[in-house]
C-alpha cells in the first residue's frame, strides 16, 4: 500500500529504487560483506567464511520479510539483519558483524545510498546546464523589460535571465564535487569511535572496507559519522531546490495573462481547470515551487540532528529515515520537471516587445539622465529634471521622450537626434558580453569535467 506521494507520484523510478527498502537492505548487506572480506584479508577470519558471507549477503538469500520478522521480535533493525544473514551462512555466520556497531553498518550504507543518489542529481544538473546554455545562446539578443520590485526598470535580455540561472547551476555542480569529498565517508570505529573492538588491525580493516565500497573513512567519529555532514548534504539539496524554485517562480510570473512573454509547455489534450475550459495553468512550475518548500523544511531537522547526547543518541535515526529519501526523491522530480519545462518553453515575441514599450519610454529615464550628465548637466540635477518629466509623462499618459522634447531644460543639452537614439533595444549595456563570458566559463568547466 502506497502512502507517501514519493511512493507513487513524485520522482523517477531510478531514484525511488535507490531508497526502496529492499535496496537499503542490500546496502547494509554489502557493508557486512565488505567487513567480512576485510577481516579475512588481515587474517581475523577464514577466507572461506568471508567467501560464503559475501556470496549470501544479498536479498536473494536474506529476505526482507525474514528481517522484519526478526525485528518485530527483538526490536533492533540492524541486529535483525545480522541474525538473518547469519542464519543463511550456517557455521560461517558466527563471523558476521565482527567488531562492528550498528552505525558502522548504517552510516556506511547510507553513504552508498547517497553516492548513488548524487550521481543522478549530478547527471540532471549537467543536463539542465546544457539546456540553459542553449537558451542563453539562442536568446542572447532577445531584449525584454527588466523588473525590480515588480515594476518596469530598464531593459535586459532573455539571454541574461538564462545565463544567470546557468551560472547558478554551474555553481551547484562545483559545490557537488566539493560536497562529495565530505559526505561520501563511512566508518568502522565501533561503539564510541575508538575502534577498540577491531583490535590492533582496526585502521587496516576500515581502510579495506572503504576501498572495497568506494568510500573514504571519516577522520574521526564517535558512534556515528557526525551529522554536520548530513546537514550540509540536506542544505545542498535545498539550495538546488531554491534555484529551481527561482526559475519556476519567474516562468510563472512571466506566464501571467497580462504579461505572457513565455509559457511552460501545454499539451494538446491537457486540462487546465475542472470548471474553466480556457485555463492554461503553469502547473509544472507551480509543482516545482511547492516541492521546494518541503526541501527547505527538511534542513531544520538535519541541523537539529547534529547535537546529540554524548557519543550519540537515537533521535537522529527516525528523522533521517524520512528526510533523506524524501529530499532526494522530491529534488529528482523537480530537476526532471524543470528540464521538461525549459526544453518546451514557449516564447511570445509580440508580447515581449509590447511590454518593453508598455510604459511609453518611462524605462528610458535612466539613459536620459545619463545622457544629460554626459552633455554637461550635473548628475543630481539631471536626476531631478528627469524625475519631474517622468512624473508628468505618467500623469498625462504620454511618451517620456515626447515630453522631454518639449522641455527647454532638456533641449538645452540634447538634440532631437540624441533623444531619438534613446531606444530600449539600444540600452542593454554589456549584456551580450556578460552572457558570452558566462558561457565561456561554463564550457571551460565542462572541459575540466566539472
Curated annotation (Swiss-Prot):
List of catalytic residues: 149 (proton donor/acceptor), 273 (proton donor/acceptor)
Record's catalysed reaction(s): N(6)-(1,2-dicarboxyethyl)-AMP = fumarate + AMP; (2S)-2-[5-amino-1-(5-phospho-beta-D-ribosyl)imidazole-4-carboxamido]succinate = 5-amino-1-(5-phospho-beta-D-ribosyl)imidazole-4-carboxamide + fumarate
Biological process terms in GO annotation: 'de novo' AMP biosynthetic process; 'de novo' IMP biosynthetic process
Pfam family, one: Lyase_1
Binding residues for N(6)-(1,2-dicarboxyethyl)-AMP: 9-10, 75-77, 101-102, 223, 274, 279-281, 318-322
SUPFAM superfamilies named in the record: L-aspartase-like
GO molecular function: (S)-2-(5-amino-1-(5-phospho-D-ribosyl)imidazole-4-carboxamido) succinate lyase (fumarate-forming) activity; N6-(1,2-dicarboxyethyl)AMP AMP-lyase (fumarate-forming) activity
Record pathway: Purine metabolism; AMP biosynthesis via de novo pathway; AMP from IMP: step 2/2; Purine metabolism; IMP biosynthesis via de novo pathway; 5-amino-1-(5-phospho-D-ribosyl)imidazole-4-carboxamide from 5-amino-1-(5-phospho-D-ribosyl)imidazole-4-carboxylate: step 2/2
Known partners and oligomeric status: Homotetramer. Residues from neighboring subunits contribute catalytic and substrate-binding residues to each active site.
Function (record text): Catalyzes two reactions in de novo purine nucleotide biosynthesis. Catalyzes the breakdown of 5-aminoimidazole- (N-succinylocarboxamide) ribotide (SAICAR or 2-[5-amino-1-(5-phospho-beta-D-ribosyl)imidazole-4-carboxamido]succinate) to 5-aminoimidazole-4-carboxamide ribotide (AICAR or 5-amino-1-(5-phospho-beta-D-ribosyl)imidazole-4-carboxamide) and fumarate, and of adenylosuccinate (ADS or N(6)-(1,2-dicarboxyethyl)-AMP) to adenosine monophosphate (AMP) and fumarate.
Family assignment from sequence similarity: Belongs to the lyase 1 family. Adenylosuccinate lyase subfamily.
Protein's recorded name: Adenylosuccinate lyase
Species, as recorded: Pyrococcus horikoshii (strain ATCC 700860 / DSM 12428 / JCM 9974 / NBRC 100139 / OT-3)
Amino acid at each position: 500500500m502506497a502512502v507517501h506521494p514519493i511512493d507513487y507520484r513524485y520522482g523517477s523510478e531510478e531514484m525511488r529504487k535507490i531508497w526502496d527498502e529492499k535496496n537499503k537492505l542490500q546496502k547494509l548487506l554489502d557493508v557486512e560483506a565488505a567487513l567480512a572480506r576485510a577481516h579475512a584479508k588481515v587474517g581475523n577470519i577464514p577466507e572461506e567464511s568471508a567467501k560464503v558471507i559475501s556470496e549470501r549477503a544479498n536479498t536473494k538469500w536474506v529476505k526482507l520479510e525474514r528481517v522484519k520478522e526478526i525485528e518485530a521480535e527483538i526490536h533492533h533493525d540492524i541486529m535483525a539483519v545480522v541474525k538473518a544473514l547469519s542464519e543463511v551462512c550456517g557455521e560461517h555466520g558466527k563471523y558476521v558483524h565482527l567488531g562492528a556497531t550498528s552505525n558502522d553498518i548504517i552510516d556506511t550504507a547510507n553513504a552508498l545510498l547517497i553516492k548513488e543518489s548524487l550521481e543522478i542529481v549530478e547527471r540532471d544538473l549537467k543536463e539542465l546546464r546544457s539546456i540553459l546554455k542553449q537558451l542563453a545562446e539562442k536568446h542572447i539578443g532577445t531584449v525584454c523589460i527588466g523588473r525590480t520590485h515588480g515594476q518596469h526598470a530598464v531593459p535586459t535580455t532573455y539571454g541574461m535571465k538564462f545565463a544567470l540561472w546557468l551560472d547558478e547551476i554551474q555553481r551547484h555542480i562545483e559545490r557537488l564535487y566539493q560536497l562529495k569529498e565530505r559526505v561520501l565517508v563511512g566508518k568502522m570505529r565501533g561503539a564510541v569511535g575508538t575502534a577498540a573492538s577491531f583490535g590492533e588491525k582496526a585502521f587496516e580493516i576500515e581502510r579495506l572496507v572503504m576501498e572495497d565500497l568506494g568510500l573514504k573513512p571519516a577522520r574521526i567519529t564517535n558512534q556515528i559519522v557526525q551529522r554536520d555532514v548530513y546537514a550540509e548534504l540536506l542544505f545542498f539539496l535545498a539550495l538546488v531546490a531554491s534555484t529551481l524554485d527561482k526559475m519556476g517562480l519567474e516562468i510563472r510570473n512571466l506566464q501571467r495573462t497580462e504579461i505572457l512573454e513565455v509559457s511552460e509547455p501545454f499539451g494538446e489534450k491537457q486540462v487546465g481547470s475542472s470548471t474553466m475550459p480556457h485555463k492554461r495553468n503553469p502547473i509544472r512550475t507551480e509543482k516545482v515551487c511547492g516541492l521546494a518548500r518541503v526541501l527547505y523544511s527538511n534542513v531544520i531537522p538535519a541541523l537539529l540532528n547534529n547535537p546529540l547526547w554524548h557519543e550519540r543518541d537515537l533521535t537522529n535515526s527516525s528523522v533521517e529515515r524520512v528526510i533523506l529519501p524524501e529530499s532526494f526523491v522530491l529534488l529528482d522530480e523537480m530537476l526532471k520537471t524543470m528540464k521538461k519545462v525549459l526544453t518546451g518553453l514557449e516564447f511570445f515575441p509580440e508580447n515581449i516587445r509590447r511590454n518593453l514599450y508598455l510604459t511609453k519610454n518611462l524605462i528610458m529615464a535612466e539613459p536620459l539622465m545619463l545622457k544629460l550628465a554626459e552633455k554637461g548637466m550635473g548628475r543630481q540635477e539631471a536626476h531631478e529634471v528627469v524625475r519631474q518629466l517622468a512624473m508628468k509623462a505618467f500623469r498625462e499618459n504620454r511618451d517620456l521622450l515626447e515630453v522631454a522634447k518639449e522641455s527647454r531644460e532638456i533641449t538645452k543639452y540634447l538634440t532631437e537626434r540624441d533623444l531619438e537614439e534613446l531606444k530600449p533595444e539600444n540600452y542593454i549595456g554589456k549584456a551580450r558580453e556578460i552572457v558570452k563570458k558566462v558561457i565561456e566559463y561554463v564550457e571551460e568547466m565542462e572541459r575540466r569535467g566539472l
